[in-house]
Amino acid sequence: MSHTAEIIAVGTELLLGNITNTNASEISRALSAVGVNVFWHTVVGDNPERLREALKIARKRADVILTTGGLGPTYDDLTKQTVCETFGKPLVLREDVLEHIRTYFARNVHLVMPENNRQQAEFPADCVIFDNPVGTAPGCAFEAEGVHVLMLPGPPFEMRTMLQNWAIPYLRGLSKEVIVSHDIMTFGLGESPMEDLMRERISQMENPSPVSYTHLTLPTT
């Protein structure tokens, strides 16, 4: 069975345009390689009400929801709390993760762990923990009412490491299907004549989703 996914990026800095949402494109490519169709990208600020609304919409139309961001130690990092409220899951403290965060601070920062980092060791009950070897924000995944929810950190390097090491193996276990994608690169042709050339071939494909896009390269002086 194929799965449909929605990626929800959490962070007011994304909406303000201070940071480009590169995570979404990277996650989409990785999910398509394991047969998960990404149908929606959503961006919400660090606001629990708007995130809750986005999650309620996503759970009605997708069976995989993947969030990035909002797993830090500050007051506006509310992804786990909001996800748990939306799906009726209690937050529980994982002592093993708390000890891991304390050790990370001692070894890498040479400081005692600040108390507000304690919330990074709280997780939905009965979830799978995704270790974070390059930061203090572990991710996690759980299934509720037929929907798989995965939460990854926002910083791209941390997200990428966790995506490759944990999220993709988790999703690969859900389905044996794959999405086959081919790129055809041309030059000197506009989109309209290219469509005429490809129409017959596309009509012979099974369940195709053709997409065209153009790129203009200006001569340099």
Segments from the language model and where they lie:
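Conserved small/polar residues in nucleotide/adenosyl-binding loops
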Residues: T214-T220
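Glycine-rich beta-strand-to-loop/alpha-helix junction loops that act as flexible
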Residues: V10-T12, T67-L71, Y75, P153-G154
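Short glycine-/aliphatic-rich beta-strand segments at the starts of folded cytosolic domains
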Residues: S175-G190
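Conserved acidic residues
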Residues: D63
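Glycine-rich phosphate/diphosphate-binding loop of Rossmann-like nucleotide-binding domains
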Residues: T4-V34, W40-H41
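Short amphipathic alpha-helix segments
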Residues: L189-N207
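Proline/glycine-rich low-complexity loops and linkers
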Residues: R50, K60, L78-L174
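Short beta->alpha junction loops
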Residues: W40-E49
